[in-house]
Amino acid sequence: MKRLGAIIAGGKATRFGSDKAAAMLNGRPLIEHVADGLRSQVDKLIVCGRAWPEMDWIGDYPFPDMGPLGGLNAALHYAQQNGFDEVLTAGCDVVPVAQFPMERPDERAIYIDGHYLFGAWPVALAPVLQEHLRDQDNLSMRGWIAAIDAQAITLTQIFHNLNAPEQLSQYAAQQSNIGIR
């Protein structure tokens, strides 16, 4: 199976108050921590929704500023056009990155329970999502997951969604206390 990794990074970061992707964690931008976690699981890695130095990127599709579904839609279409079977997604603000199961009981899309941007999406969903997005009032990730009957999976790994500078500071302090740099 050929997998495309996509970091969803086109949000406005209103709760964070500044560019989350560029926020520093242990001396490196947050997006680079996410990229490191995805690289070992995919054949190619891209950033969706914004440019980032030294990484391939694509804009949201079909329009900018569509939120996570615009990034996922862009990634699915890119994957479809370039011979990938599946897209693994992660937000630019959640660490550490999940290790997705390689084998699953069926072909449904999966996402990590409580972390909707951590998902594995079959490329066959590209036209389905495109149709879903025709309704501009239907940009909810949760709504999309329900519409396609994606399967929630539970992992024992703990994730940290860093939506505010204070959360980033707390996470960095925890990492420092256990000797992670």
Locate the predicted segments by residue.
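C-terminal intrinsically disordered extensions
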Residues: 173-181
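Short amphipathic alpha-helices within nucleic acid-binding modules
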Residues: 167-173
